[in-house]
Amino acid sequence: MKTLLLTLVVLTIACLDLGYTKTCFNDDLTNPKTTELCRHSVYFCFKNSWIAGGVERIERGCSLTCPDIKYNGKYIYCCTRDNCNA
């Protein structure tokens, strides 16, 4: 009986995947790239890029939603895998 209970507990923990946290790149133009651990409920990594004053600007990080706004030449990319916003 104890073996069955232990097996059920192990399977429950494995199925819930407790403690998983998404990681996303969070730098601007630094090299090497740095990462951040996103909050538990965050599903997206994002990358915003645009031209300002003739220089390309880049912003990366974690996001709760995937913004679909592209205005004034701003490009927004979202993804759901770890470190996919390179």
From Swiss-Prot:
Disulfide bonds join 24-45, 38-62, 66-78, 79-84. Expressed by the venom gland. Residues 1-21 form the signal peptide. Keywords: Disulfide bond, Secreted, Signal, Toxin. GO terms for cellular component: extracellular region. SUPFAM superfamilies: Snake toxin-like. It is found in: Secreted. One of its GO terms (molecular function) is toxin activity. InterPro entries: Snake_3FTx, Snake_toxin-like_sf, Snake_toxin_con_site, Toxin_cobra-type. PROSITE patterns: SNAKE_TOXIN. It comes from the Eukaryota. Belongs to the three-finger toxin family. Short-chain subfamily. Orphan group IX sub-subfamily. This is Neurotoxin-like protein pMD18-NTL3. It comes from Bungarus multicinctus (Many-banded krait).
